[in-house]
Curated annotation (Swiss-Prot):
Gene: ligA
Alphabetized Pfam families for the sequence: BRCT, DNA_ligase_aden, DNA_ligase_OB, DNA_ligase_ZBD, HHH_2, HHH_5, Nlig-Ia
A GO MF label: metal ion binding
Name of this chain's protein: DNA ligase
Needed cofactors: Mg(2+); Mn(2+)
Organism of this sequence: Dehalococcoides mccartyi (strain ATCC BAA-2100 / JCM 16839 / KCTC 5957 / BAV1)
């Protein structure tokens, strides 16, 4: 009998000891034994479990890794939604949030929890009877992907809760890669000849979504718990701060930089300190989260859309770095615009290597006094688009000269300003900021037109991107957009590095694009000043391309949102015989030039309603959401105005949400928007 029980006793003792050392090492950062001693304990436990497989349990430390790869992730329904946070970008916006909370609470005093806003991936961890049962991604806030097996590989996530933990509870946390862990991971990938991750967040997200948990286990992922989702223990304190302290004591990792403050000024000071020390943090953070501490007051404040009223994320300013502006280059757009851009010494900005940045136009360059050879400050606007903020005047060469578009475009061979691609005449219309190439046959214009025509927002022809558009134009295979529909596999096989399968796929994609809606065709034609919103208006008003082609200036000006400039541009486009000839060839090739949408009438569900969509939606893309709005008679706009009736709010909404709130625009969560669609 003693022989029977001794392995069980040793296994239980080993698990208890290993879990204790995991807690000391991964959570408390206070190890008692060396890595070699820890490995010895793990090795002995594995030996015993291999000899006695009946003793293996899901919560054993050996079971963090080793399961078979999944074919797909399952779905987990969140018992309580994982809401996203409203953003503040200034002290003024933070103060506005604070005053709204005070007003809603009737001036009841409240404390504020201050927490670094980790730039990772939100997850929900559910424990049942002391065991880690389920782990899921945020998903759309209501449903997430079941990534339990991958989360088990993260050593700072306890597989067992302490005996005094609630019988069933869910905690929420942010999985992330430290800066050092990210650098180490990319070094290893470089050594193996694998593509590098752009930034720690992408690396963490990609690691958690591996179907094979052994791959996740190789990534140095970590977690901070930031909230209690729900609990069956009704005796937990009425304080977010005290709840996190409780979970810290029973084995969960809580950010040691969290603070509890009593006033708005203390909250602002916390933000200033975190922003000042951002670069020295061991992980990426993009702001600070402020929360009303009292749980009962949180419930009283409730939610609006998909955001809690009792919390806000105060984002850090865009990361700025210095580099040298080597040259101001000029590119040619599809409508002939001459677009200046900065050629930079490559520099890492927020995890992305930036080599070029937009400069908009000559007036903007002169306003900022940006010159070639300057040391300049670069940031990624909205953490996405690289832009030149300003020159560093103390580092400027005293012999540098202000930028002049006409000087930059002067062609000594022609003894005049000229398009840098075709040598065509240059002009700048009165009242406009842009210079234009006057040559409608400019090859650079057509390359951009072709790229625009095949783009996702227009005809969405998969397989033809920027580089292939240029090759097709330069090889003379496509002289106007209608030529695409007369290409053959044999034509494409003439191109360098083009295989038969790739050529067949492109021909199939071109054929598939023939059934795109009329508004996509109109947008794809690239009529000056006609964006996708205007293209949709024209499609629904006229119903077919030939009715639009024959319309006059006066009729166009009667259509809402079609101003004089747009109307004149449309008439000018269709008065060009070469443009009409292209449309005829599109029709002959079988491209659909009529609309199957019902004409807008006052009885359609969304008739008279104007929507703006912001943030990232889970159920469909922004373009798909806009199409659904238009199909029900509504108007989908890109910007919030006084005419906006509804703002559809997805994850990570930014300035549009702030503007909408200041104007009293009604907000819709994604789920509320879907309900409106279903009821219509």
């Amino acid at each position: 009998m003693e022989d029977m029980f001794s392995p069980l006793i040793e296994v239980e003792n080993l698990r208890r000891e290993i879990n204790r050392h995991n807690q000391l090492y991964y959570v408390q950062d206070n190890p008692e034994i060396s890595d070699a001693q820890y490995d010895t304990l793990i090795r002995r436990l594995k030996e015993l479990e291999e000899a006695h497989p009946e003793l293996v349990t899901p919560d054993s430390p050996t079971q963090r890794v080793g399961a078979e790869p999944l074919k797909a992730f399952g779905i987990v329904n969140h018992p309580y939604p994982l809401l996203s946070l409203a953003n503040a970008f200034s002290d003024t916006e933070l103060e506005a949030w604070y005053q709204r909370v005070k007003k809603l609470l009737g001036n009841i005093p409240f404390q504020i929890d201050c927490e670094p806003k980790m730039d990772g991936l939100a997850v929900a961890l559910t424990y049942r009877n002391g065991k880690f049962a389920t782990g899921a991604t945020r998903g759309d806030g209501f449903q997430g992907e079941n990534i339990t097996r991958n989360l088990r590989t993260i050593h700072s996530i306890p597989l067992n809760a302490e005996p005094n933990a609630p019988p069933v509870f869910e905690v929420r946390g942010e999985v992330y890669l430290s800066k050092n862990g990210f650098a180490k991971l990319n070094r290893e990938r470089a050594d193996k000849g694998l593509p590098l991750f752009a930034n720690p967040r992408n690396a963490a997200a990609g690691s958690l979504r591996q179907l094979d948990p052994s791959v996740t286990a190789e990534r140095p992922l970590d977690i901070f718990i930031y909230a209690l989702g729900y609990s069956e223990d009704s005796l937990l304190p009425d304080s977010h701060w005290q709840i996190l302290d409780y979970f810290s004591k029973i084995g969960f990792r809580i950010n040691p930089l969290n603070r509890l403050v009593n006033t708005l000024e203390e909250a602002k000071e916390y933000y200033r300190q975190m922003a000042a020390n951002r670069a020295s943090l061991p992980y990426e953070a993009d702001g600070v989260v402020f929360k009303v501490d009292s749980v009962s007051l949180q419930h009283r404040l409730g939610d609006v859309g998909r955001e809690p009223r009792w919390a806000i994320a105060y984002k850090f300013p865009a990361e700025q770095v210095m580099t040298r502006l080597k040259k101001i280059g000029i590119s040619v757009g599809r409508t002939g615009t001459l677009n200046p851009f900065a050629v930079l010494e490559p520099v890492n900005v927020g995890g992305v290597v930036v080599k070029q940045a937009a400069l908009h136009n000559e007036d903007d360059i002169l306003r900022k006094d940006i010159r070639e050879g300057d040391t300049v400050i670069i940031q990624r606007a909205g953490e996405v688009i690289p832009e030149v903020v300003a020159p560093v005047l103390s580092k400027r060469n005293p012999e540098s000269k202000p930028f002049r578009m006409e000087e930059s475009l002067f062609n000594p061979n022609l003894n005049r300003t000229a398009c840098p691609v075709c040598g065509g005449e240059i002009y700048r219309p009165a009242g406009e900021a842009m210079h234009y190439c006057a040559n409608v046959s400019c090859p650079a214009q057509f390359e951009r037109q072709l790229e625009h025509f095949v783009s996702r927002g227009a005809m969405d022809i998969r397989g033809i991107g920027e580089s292939l558009s240029v090759i097709l134009a330069q090889q003379g295979l496509v002289k106007n957009v209608s030529d695409l529909y007369y290409l053959t596999t044999a034509d494409l096989l003439q191109l360098p590095r083009m295989g038969e399968k790739s050529a067949d796929n492109i021909i199939d994609a071109i054929a598939d694009s023939k059934t795109r809606p009329l508004d996509r065709v109109i947008f794809g034609l690239g009529v000056r000043h006609v964006g996708n919103e205007t293209a949709t208006l024209l499609s629904r008003h006229y119903g077919n391309i030939w009715a639009l082609a024959k319309t006059g200036l006066g009729e166009l000006q009667t259509i809402p949102d079609i101003g004089d400039k747009i109307a004149s541009s449309i008439v000018a486009y269709f008065s060009e015989e070469k443009n009409v000839a292209v449309i005829r060839r599109l029709e002959e090739a079988g491209v659909r030039l009529t609309s199957d949408q019902k004409p807008v009438n006052k009885n359609m569900p969304f008739s008279g309603m104007e929507f703006v969509v912001t943030g990232k939606l889970e159920s469909f893309s922004r373009e798909e959401a806009q199409e659904k709005i238009r199909s029900l008679g509504g108007t989908a706009k890109d910007n919030v105005t006084k005419a906006t009736n509804y703002l559809v709010v997805g994850a990570d909404a930014g300035s549009k949400l702030t503007k909408a709130r200041s104007m009293g625009v009604k907000e819709l969560s994604e789920r509320e928007f879907i309900n409106m669609l279903e009821q219509s």
